[in-house]
Structure formats: C-alpha cells, structure tokens
C-alpha cells in the first residue's frame, strides 16, 4: 500500500477516492507539508532543485542554438538582416498537403519552416556570432553546463555534500556571493566579451579562441588603464555612417557615453553597452564586499535593522525583529525575490522596444511586438506570485510575538486604511475613465464627435519635454536651448540622446495625446485593482473582520458562497485567484495599447490611433476587428496562406479559453452526479466493464475546479492574443 502515489503523504496515499491523485499533484511541490520533513531537508531539497532548474534552462537555450544552426539561415540573415526572414526551425510534417508546403517555404529555405520572432538572431549577431559553427559551439557548451548542473544537483543531495541549515541562513555570505560573484563578476565577464569579441566583430575584426590573445581590443592596449588616462578608451567613436559588421566608418573607442542609437542598426551603441556593464560590475563588486562575514569588518544586516528605528517614534519599534522573520521564512524571501523579478521583467519589456539593445531589432516589428507582450505577461504572473507567497508567509511563518510593534506588525494593524485607500483609488479611476470612454462613445454614435471630452496629458508631455522632446514647445530643461544641461549634453555626455528623442522613426518617448491619457488611466485602474485584491488577500490571510481566526484554515481553503456566514472575504487563495483575472485583464489593455500605437506608427498613420482610441467602439472596431481580418482569412475557399497556423491557433485559443468557464461557472453537486452516472453506465456496459479502477471518482473540490478554470482561461487568453499579435503584425510587415 505504501507504494501508491503520493509517496510523500501517507494520509493522502490511503485516500480511497480520485482526490488522492489531484491533491497529490497539487501538493507535490509543497515540501513543507510532506511527511517527515525537517527544516534541514526542506532547504536541501530546494537548493538541489535549483540546479535542476539551471539544467533545464541551459538545455533549452542550447536547443535554440542547435536548431537554428541545423535548420536556420543565420549566415544568410547576417548578410542582409533587413530583408532575409530569420528561420527558427523546420516543420517536419506540414498538414494540409501541397498548399501548406508552399505557404511555409520561405526565408530562402528549401522546405517548410517557422519564422523566428524571438529576437535570438539579432542577439547572437550583436554579441559577435557570425557562423553556424559559432552556434554549434555555443550549443555544445550549454549542454556541458547543463550536465554539470544536473551532477551538482545530485551531488548536493549526497550525505557528504549536503549543506547545513546554518549555511543557508548565513545572509551576509550569501549577499556577498550573489552581489560580487554572480552580478558583479558576470557583468565584468560580459564587458570582457563585448570589448574583446562583440565590438571588434561589429567593426569587421574576427576574434576567436585562436587569436583573442594576440588581437588588442584597443590600439593603446592596457597602457591608458594603468596610466589613469581612461578617457582615451572613449575617444574616436564609430562614425554616424558606420556599417555594422564592417570596418567602414568604424572607430577604436571601447567604452563610451554617446547616447541615442547607431543610425544603421537603430540599436544602442555597443560601446555604450560595454561601458554600462563595466559600471554595473564595479558597483556590484564593491557592494559584495560590504557585509560582515569571517573577517569581523563590514555591515551586519541584523544590526542595521535593529538600529534603524525612525525618529519621533512614528513607526514604533521600526525594523526590530525583521531580520529573523525574513531569514527564517522561505516564503517571505520568495515573495521579495518574485516582487523584484516581476518589476525587472516588466522593465525589460519597456526598455527592449524603447532602447533596443540588439542590432536591427527595431526594424523587425513582429519580434518587437512579441518580446514586449511576452515579457509583460511573464511579469504579471511573477508579480501575482509574490503576493501569493506573501499571504502564505502570514499564515505559516509570521510570529506576532517576534514582530511586536515593528513596521510589519503596524502594516497589519492599519490594513483597513491601506485597503480602503486602494479601494477608493480603484473606484475613482474606474468610474472616471469608463465615464469618459462611454461619453465619447455615445457622442460618436450620435454623430457629434466634436462633443467628445478629450484631455491632453500635459503633465506627461512636460516630463517628456524635460527629457528633451521639443515637439510640445514647453522649452524646459533639455528641450530649452538656453539650459546649462542642454549645453553640457551636446558635448560632455550623451550627445546622441537629443537626436534620438526627437527622431520619429524610433519608439523613444512617443508623442502622446488624449487617447494615451485615457488608456493610461484604464491601465492605472487595472494595476490598482489587481494590487487591491492581492494586498487584501495577503493582509487578511490570518484573519479578517469577518473571521479573525482563520490561521488554522491554511492558505487554500475556498470562498464557498453564503454558507457559514459568508466566507468570500477571507480566503487568501481566492484573492490570488481573482487577482490573476485582473492581472490578465490589465496586461490585455497594456498590450492592446502598445500594439495598436505601434502598428499605426510603423504604417505611418498615427492619426488612426489618435482619432479612434478615445472611444470604446474605436478600440473594438479599428484595433481588434480590423486587425483580426487577416487572421480569420488564414483559410478561405482559395486555399491557405502562411498565416493559417495562426488562424488555427486563434480558434484553438478561443476554445481553450471558453472551456475555462465550464469549470469556473459550475456547481460541484452537478459534477458529482454526472460522474456517478457515467461510472454507473460504464460498469453496466459489456466490454467497457472489463476495465475497472480502484479509486472512487469524486468531483473536483471548489479550489481545484477554480484552478483548472483559471488555467484554461489564462492559457486560452494568451494563445488567442499571441496568434492575433503575430499574425496581424507579420501579415502587415512581412
């Protein structure tokens, strides 16, 4: 009996119903709840699993390199990045016969292929890779790293190599190692690669293992470094007519502060990027020497926190007790890490298009759209996860005794004020924004567009002007020619910035108007509402006004309607579940806005966005409906085209999304009855009744059904929009 799944829970493995399987899957990664789990084993299991995670990442990136080298057209693309379409991989078995083979044979390939919209071609080209052999070398190196990671994971589960809990809880050593070792040294190594390999390659000089010790990255070598004349490395930059990948118009500078974009590739200057990574390396290597470990010098985080009591007693005992609370709670640490990573991922989305780091990325519109959307969705899921683990921290790890009257306890004590303020902000944003959209919609419908309420975003325009955008005529800071900052900028720092910000061919500080003002506030509504649900779920996780003592209920009990006095106010899991819908909703608005604004910009008809984005029908008709026309046309009576796969995915995405509602809007008793009817019929049907099962079938629990519904809703929603985004963009721009 002991061998039944799940092995980690005796109680669950003896459950006679199908609940055993579902609960087993649900709690497989909740190591804390497993039988015989000690704190030490918990830390060791998580530590070892990190190596498995790394192995998967290395294997996946290796696969990207390998398939492009084997089936792609990297070398041909490098000869003409603007006109050759990059191939991701071949399609072995294109369905629907000869028309499909013809539709998907493109990019100079001999058979059907998929086009790459991930930006890897641009990235590899920028960092100095040029041949398929380079790609194969990279793939092999990553497979070796992957194997080493797997071995390391296995090794750290062996008795001799298992770290002790005290090692995991040594915060200072870990910070030093992560700051100096991981961030600092890896940034320094990346600077080295850019200076020794990528920058020479961008100037037509091929540096590889056979010559990298003999080719100087700078004609002066290390002389200026030791002489303290570092400015020599910034002299003689690439000229504005530099042809990327050749010596034509190339300079010799390696660390610069030019600002703006390389005129041909429309991407940041490689020498600026190298300079940036060197600065990061210096800062982080210094930061990683700040904390006290074996030598008795440096900061102790615990001492800093204990001493940090704000003046005037306004925050009670300040940060006392926080060190142990955080250091002993994996959920708190995970929550902090996810919050940071979520913000960083969203910043990647924002900067990837506005300051494109890779050569020719800015001219590959579909890839830009795909990268923006991808990173925003990832950010949304990571951020909601931060609050989920924050809530679990309050239920499982928070000790009121240890945190008496410190900042954490005071957060809980005035949670009503926090929640009501967020609620007020959400209501204000929601009613006013919707009110403006609906008013404008009605005015358009009644044929009086001049009666719309159109608000210019003057504060945002002022901020753009302060950064140097001259269009609005504000004449302030960098947009004022008399300003000292303006004059310094011409020569000392970032001389290319003002050209870039006032050039309409890039996405830096896009011109904004009333449509942007409205959608900005719609997005603000989404962000505040998502935050409200998440913050309330976490702050009310242990107890709320309706149910002050819910700690023992755990994290994932359901809100199950009006029974027991109404429990919808009190489940932390339910708050997370509702917040994910709002998160998806918000990111929908964000990506719709980004995409529509950009396709009108790229097509040279920005007026369409400006005029149609101020009322609801404009969004529905001129963005969604108009841009889905090619998609719905992937198959037609005349055969098929290369968008057909996206047309199919668009339909399939809607199907998956709609299936979600079957689980979301359902009554558990109905399912139980249906299951028992099916089981009864099965047992009485000849032949079918030869197959028996041991577990009694029971309906999913409320929480499980919600999770399954949410998963279908999310996956279907993302599939549908991904297909729409890629097809509508690639259909227009090839």
UniProtKB/Swiss-Prot annotation:
Source domain of life: Eukaryota
Cofactor binding: number and manner: P700 is a chlorophyll a/chlorophyll a' dimer, A0 is one or more chlorophyll a, A1 is one or both phylloquinones and FX is a shared 4Fe-4S iron-sulfur center.
Binding residues annotated for [4Fe-4S] cluster, in chain numbering: 559, 568
Biological-process GO terms, alphabetical: photosynthesis
Catalysed reactions, semicolon-separated: reduced [plastocyanin] + hnu + oxidized [2Fe-2S]-[ferredoxin] = oxidized [plastocyanin] + reduced [2Fe-2S]-[ferredoxin]
EC numbers: 1.97.1.12
Membership in a protein family: Belongs to the PsaA/PsaB family.
Protein's recorded name: Photosystem I P700 chlorophyll a apoprotein A2
Species: Marchantia polymorpha (Common liverwort)
Taxonomic placement: Eukaryota, Viridiplantae, Streptophyta, Embryophyta, Marchantiophyta
